Amino acid sequence: DFARIRDDIYQATGVESVYYRFPGGSSNTVSNIDMHEFIDYLDSQGVEYFDWNVSSGDGGSSNLSIDTLLENCTEDIDTRDTSIILLHDSAEKPTTVEALPDIIENILARPDTVILPITENTRPVHHVE
């Protein structure tokens, strides 16, 4: 599945994907494949995986309030050097997208805090090593 999807992404964008997020994170307990084997496979393909250390909480609920999403996404980011926030974008979770302007504004208003893309210089967050 991974190779096919990676190929599809390349065909659609012309960009080779070098980052991966496990559905449920690398610590998920429902995968049919041993996560360490999959991590080794990603390593062999030159792909870095990223988990998250801040959760919006929208994965378990279909429609959290904007205020709840804002609080979940911003309450602990000052305690970390790097925060990677997990958000879900789907038709069943419209308030997640609606909350984004408030989340971004809140983060950008903090001193010494910036929003950056994930690059080869980003220290990955891993649930499982």
Segments (PLM) and residue ranges:
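Catalytic domains of cell-wall/extracellular-matrix polysaccharide-remodeling enzymes
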Residues: 1-86, 90-108, 114, 120-128
